[in-house]
């Protein structure tokens, strides 16, 4: 009896928060759900409204966005919303979205990796029109146009086209690993294959550099991502949570909280000012709830660290070296 009471008391704050937040269950059923955090607040896009979920009680207003699915990315006081296939871009200032340019959705970069550099929105990769992309694009807010980022690396010596890559932008370098890659045996993504390579694009030299072969634990890809997590880009699958710290070549595997089933999470965001996560999770087959969890409640306290990649020479270069030495 005493043990049951202790467990109930431990879970009570979380259950109470969920019941207060989930005032209207219909807000969790929209096809364009997006949880994101900016500065001290966290928000939920659902249907034609944006909800400030960090307010108590939550507040709502119309967002004025096109009815698309979006990715959110921020850096300092800058924030952008870009549609999932690139092309449609909004800034986010004073909790208001402002359309930048009048481009239509590109339909060619689903599953791209967004980041901000020199106050500009950039994207890498994506899939669309039956091709995997290995391009970097940059959006010019002044002109409302998107342009290709130049590189001096030859096409046959650079990163392959990827959809849903894992990445991190830091110190003027873009790091990319894993991602869905073109499968010559199933070119229309009927059978997905993942890249086993890690790459770095240096914006100072405009070159792509091969880093090595990725940890086999990255071979499954991911389901959800949090790019503003302080320990590196955070990724979740149905039974795994890990963050990537590319500058230190470290992948941190979080062994999980006993309070949470990762497979039940449908959306999440990290709020730095609160030091925790807002998540939308399934309570059962028909009910969902919005919760706030601290890091320990979300990820657990046990962390295992491994290298993201091992330094190996690509087979093409290895063959060239063998030929040179044999001569």
At which residue positions do the language-model features occur?
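Repeated scaffold domains used in trafficking and secretory/extracellular systems
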Residues: 24-39, 64-76, 106-115, 157-166, ...
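Entry beta-strands of beta-propeller and related beta-repeat scaffolds
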Residues: 41-42, 77-80, 119-123, 172-177, ...
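Residue-level signature of beta-propeller blades and closely related beta-rich strand-turn architectures
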Residues: 48, 85, 127-129, 180-182, ...
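Beta-propeller fold detector
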Residues: 56-57, 61-64, 98-104, 146-154, ...
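Short, conserved, GDST-rich strand-edge loop motifs in beta-rich repeat architectures
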Residues: 126-128, 133, 177-193
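Beta-propeller blade signature
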Residues: 134-144, 189-206, 241-249, 288-306
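Extracytoplasmic/lumenal ectodomains and periplasmic regions of secretory and membrane proteins
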Residues: 225-230, 234-300
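C-terminal single-pass membrane-anchor helix
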Residues: 304-327
